[in-house]
Amino acid sequence: MQSNKTFNLEKQNHTPRKHHQHHHQQQHHQQQQQQPPPPPIPANGQQASSQNEGLTIDLKNFRKPGEKTFTQRSRLFVGNLPPDITEEEMRKLFEKYGKAGEVFIHKDKGFGFIRLETRTLAEIAKVELDNMPLRGKQLRVRFACHSASLTVRNLPQYVSNELLEEAFSVFGQVERAVVIVDDRGRPSGKGIVEFSGKPAARKALDRCSEGSFLLTTFPRPVTVEPMDQLDDEEGLPEKLVIKNQQFHKEREQPPRFAQPGSFEYEYAMRWKALIEMEKQQQDQVDRNIKEAREKLEMEMEAARHEHQVMLMRQDLMRRQEELRRMEELHNQEVQKRKQLELRQEEERRRREEEMRRQQEEMMRRQQEGFKGTFPDAREQEIRMGQMAMGGAMGINNRGAMPPAPVPAGTPAPPGPATMMPDGTLGLTPPTTERFGQAATMEGIGAIGGTPPAFNRAAPGAEFAPNKRRRY
């Protein structure tokens, strides 16, 4: 359907304007008679119609799936514009082909630029509006040069359009990325990258020229250079050739084959020999470059193998070093744990020894306190002995007094003590009770009734020196 419309439009452009309008009006009148009236045009801007022509374009049919809109590829150059044209008139001129994204007019030089939604719509507008008369001038519509496009060479074999776009998107927004292939679909090692602006293209060109930009594992960098803007669609029409003196001189002879033996033939053959030599030298250069590439690839593979082996060795050494370091750390941890256990054991023993000493000290203090409160038997015997000796001395003093007359035949009363032949008193040892004065002392008789406590002398008796009566 699209090709038929394009063919009809191209055919109409080669007919006179009046005949074209008359023929189109007749065709439109016949369509109105045969078909019902068309539905109303929606207000969403997806369909548009021109004032001069009744042809409508469905914009949905001219947009490919996933195609980016308003790119540099859909930018048109419009020449031979009237000097008084405005942007509003130019938008109205292209209103049939959808909403324009960019309109620029250079009134002094008589040209301008306009950007449409898609490449297909721009192609249709170019075909329909090229050579259209406008205020006494014929419009010249061409595709604008893409100044932000780059040519990429030395692409690896397994680089696709998507990978190429992803790789160069680090420099800026990429509108289109294409890997050029031959007629069999095999990659040629070349590609085209189109950016949305010149700064991104300049950045990519500078970075790739200064460094080595790799796209795959294969370490062959790509080369980037500005793309040659060549017009292989319109070419050079006869009407655009400058008709100067050199033009007329060159056009004196029509196209022909040179006759053998003539002047033209001789120099034509010399030109052919030069061209053949250039071709042979170019082929030789290509062969040398190919051999050098193959040699470099072989060296690169060998070096890559050695590099991988070296990396494996380094990784093995690194792992061994890491294992050794882990073992050292483990040994240090074990030593620290052992030292900690030894310190804990020593601390435990020290605490036990301290507790034992404290217990012994406590027991010793308890024993000393018990002894201080309750004197032992030896001390008690000494004290009782001293008391007994004091009492004996008092008795002896008493015995020095003249005895009372005792009737004959009366037995002597029992005294408190009896002098032994060895000069000692016949006293019984004191008891071990705490209060010895309460015990009954043998060998000491009652003197005038109940014996006094602590060996007190009888009333009226004389006391020893340094002794006083106890009450």
Curated annotation (Swiss-Prot):
The modification N6-acetyllysine is found at K5, K11, K198, K295, K371. The modification Phosphoserine is found at S147, S262. GO terms for molecular function: chromatin binding; DNA binding; identical protein binding; lncRNA binding; RNA binding. Keywords: Acetylation, Activator, Biological rhythms, Chromosomal rearrangement, Chromosome, Coiled coil, DNA damage, DNA recombination, DNA repair, DNA-binding, Immunity, Innate immunity, Intellectual disability, Isopeptide bond, Methylation, mRNA processing, mRNA splicing, Nucleus, Phosphoprotein, Repeat, Repressor, RNA-binding, Transcription, Transcription regulation, Ubl conjugation. The keyword Transmembrane helix does not apply. CDD domains: NOPS_p54nrb_PSF_PSPC1, RRM1_p54nrb. Residues 268-372 form a coiled coil. There is a cross-link at K5, K60, K96, K99, K126, K190, K198, K243, K249, K371, K467 (Glycyl lysine isopeptide (Lys-Gly) (interchain with G-Cter in SUMO2)). Residues 54-373 are annotated as: DBHS. GO terms for biological process: activation of innate immune response; cellular response to angiotensin; cellular response to hypoxia; circadian rhythm; DNA recombination; DNA repair; innate immune response; mRNA processing. It is found in: Nucleus; Nucleus, Nucleolus; Nucleus speckle; Chromosome. One of its GO terms (cellular component) is fibrillar center. The keyword Transcription applies. The modification Omega-N-methylarginine is found at R456. InterPro entries: NOPS (IPR012975), Nucleotide-bd_a/b_plait_sf (IPR012677), p54nrb_RRM1 (IPR034552), RBD_domain_sf (IPR035979), RRM_dom (IPR000504). Residues 74-141, 148-229 form the RRM domain. PANTHER family: RNA RECOGNITION MOTIF-CONTAINING. It is linked to A chromosomal aberration involving NONO may be a cause of papillary renal cell carcinoma (PRCC). Translocation t(X;X)(p11.2;q13.1) with TFE3. DNA- and RNA binding protein, involved in several nuclear processes. Binds the conventional octamer sequence in double-stranded DNA. Also binds single-stranded DNA and RNA at a site independent of the duplex site. Involved in pre-mRNA splicing, probably as a heterodimer with SFPQ. Interacts with U5 snRNA, probably by binding to a purine-rich sequence located on the 3' side of U5 snRNA stem 1b. Together with PSPC1, required for the formation of nuclear paraspeckles. The SFPQ-NONO heteromer associated with MATR3 may play a role in nuclear retention of defective RNAs. This is Non-POU domain-containing octamer-binding protein. The gene is NONO.
